[in-house]
């Protein structure tokens, strides 16, 4: 006897059943609408990339999370994509005649062998939007505006878009006198400020071999607070001797001014110089979005990466963009009950019941006409009592059942039943589609 295979998923992976996919599609469609409203075009890249394409772009800590792949008879070392930015860089390097600026979005799964937890999976979708070939801060501000518009369109009213700049972080390291080889550890510690507090950061810095006087200067800096413009003013006072930090502060001031002109609400944007995006390829402004509840991590994250494409071409090309974590966004929307009531459990709008074998051709013809009129329609596929057919429709969330019995057939009518309210009405068969649509819009 053949051994029974357990239907288990790999750790950190999950199935998305139709009801979940319908909710996901609702969210993704809203995201896509906003992306395209700003003129970003769709792009698709393969799930598998050459390993050498991905390695050396993210940093050692991130690269430990990559999934390697190899065909039994193949020689190429391959890997599942870790994000969508490096594949974009490869595409731009391979198609250097693309008109600039090149504005693209991509909605696709990526894979990371992280420890699974709430809102974090090993296979998850990213919704990326990027602009390549535009060096000015207007491109960065537009990316932030896109994030603002997406979350507003989805119904979020309480969220914060955090802004920082890698140049400011570099300046902090310079002014504090931290050696270059200790900067990655410095950044990781600063990034934990909100979670572990000033005392925890100080302990981490001291344990990371950062000199006491440098730790003291860093502690003074980390106590800077206030509104965005106030924070930038204080940073300019503290970091005035760093030309690089001055550039970063100026870039954030320009972005804030542009966001005002774009109509982005000031209370949704905050400069947070302790925010550190983990990927090493960022070179300028960085941004992420968080919500107060549930504490689920960042919903979006990105920044400017002017040197990434140059790793493929030998010539730097300015680029900026962000990624929306669709899993986390949906998790938050479900926990907050934010999904509209009109997002149904099924794509089917009407079930045409089958009275008996003699009336099956009439039921099939009715279903065909409904589909031609734009109504998603099922015909019940088994010979079962009408009560079983209604039970199926109710269980699967189909909003309307249609009856075509001998009396209806002779009269050229059908009977519609609204399964949520139990209301019934008889209508001429040619008006069935309009009647179904009217009821479906109420569901």
Where are these regions (language model features)?
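Auxiliary tRNA-acceptor-end handling modules of aminoacyl-tRNA synthetases
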Residues: 1-21, 70, 179
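Positively charged, Gly/Ser-enriched RNA/tRNA-binding surfaces
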Residues: 2, 21-40, 49-52, 75, ...
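Phosphate-rich ligand and nucleic-acid binding surfaces
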Residues: 15, 31, 173-181
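Polyanion/phosphate-binding surface patch
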Residues: 43-78, 120
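Short low-complexity, flexible loop/linker segments enriched in glycine and/or proline
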Residues: 57-61, 175-177, 394-395, 416-419
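Acidic, His- and aromatic-enriched active-site or binding-groove loops in soluble protein domains
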Residues: 62-73, 178-199, 291-292
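Short, conserved secondary-structure transition motifs
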Residues: 163-176, 191-197
């Amino acid at each position: 006897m053949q051994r029974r295979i357990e239907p288990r998923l790999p750790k950190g992976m999950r199935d998305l059943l139709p009801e979940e996919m319908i909710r996901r599609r609702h969210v993704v469609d809203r995201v896509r609408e906003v992306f395209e409203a700003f003129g970003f075009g769709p792009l698709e890249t393969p799930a598998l990339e050459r390993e050498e394409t991905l390695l050396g772009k993210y940093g050692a800590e991130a690269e430990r999370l990559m999934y390697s792949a190899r065909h039994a008879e193949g020689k190429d070392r391959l890997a599942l994509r870790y994000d969508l930015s490096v594949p974009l860089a490869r595409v731009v390097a391979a198609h250097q005649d693309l008109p600039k600026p090149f504005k693209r979005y991509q909605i696709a799964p990526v894979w990371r062998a992280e420890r699974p937890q709430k809102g974090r999976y090993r296979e998850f979708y990213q919704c990326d939007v990027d602009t390549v070939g535009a060096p000015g801060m207007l491109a960065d501000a537009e990316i932030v505006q896109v994030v603002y518009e997406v979350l507003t369109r989805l119904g979020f009213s309480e969220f914060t878009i955090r802004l920082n700049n890698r140049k400011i972080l570099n300046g902090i390291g310079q002014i504090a006198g931290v050696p270059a080889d200790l900067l990655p550890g410095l950044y990781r510690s600063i990034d934990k400020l909100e979670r572990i507090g000033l005392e925890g950061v100080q302990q981490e810095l001291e344990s990371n071999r950062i000199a006491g006087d440098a730790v003291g200067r860093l502690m003074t800096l980390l106590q800077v607070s206030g509104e965005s413009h106030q924070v930038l003013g204080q940073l300019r006072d503290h970091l005035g001797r760093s030309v690089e930090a001055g550039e970063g502060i100026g870039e954030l001031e320009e972005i804030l001014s542009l966001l005002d002109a774009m109509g982005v609400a000031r209370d949704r944007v905050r400069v947070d110089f302790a925010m550190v995006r983990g990927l090493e390829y960022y070179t300028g402004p960085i941004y992420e979005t968080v919500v107060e509840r549930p504490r689920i991590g960042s919903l979006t994250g990105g920044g400017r990466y002017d040197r990434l494409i140059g790793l493929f071409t030998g010539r730097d090309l300015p680029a900026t963009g962000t990624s929306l974590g669709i899993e986390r966004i949906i998790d938050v929307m479900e926990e907050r009950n934010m999904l509209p009531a009109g997002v149904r459990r099924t794509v089917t709008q009407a079930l045409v019941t089958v009275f008996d074998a003699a009336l099956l051709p009439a039921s099939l013809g009715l279903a065909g006409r409904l589909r031609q009129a734009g109504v998603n329609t099922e015909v019940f596929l088994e010979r079962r009592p009408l009560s079983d057919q209604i039970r199926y429709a109710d269980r699967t969330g189909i909003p309307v059942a249609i009856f075509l019995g001998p009396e209806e057939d002779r009269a050229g009518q059908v009977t519609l039943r609204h399964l949520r309210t139990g209301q019934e009405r008889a209508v001429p068969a040619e008006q069935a589609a309009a009647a179904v649509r009217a009821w479906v819009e109420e569901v």
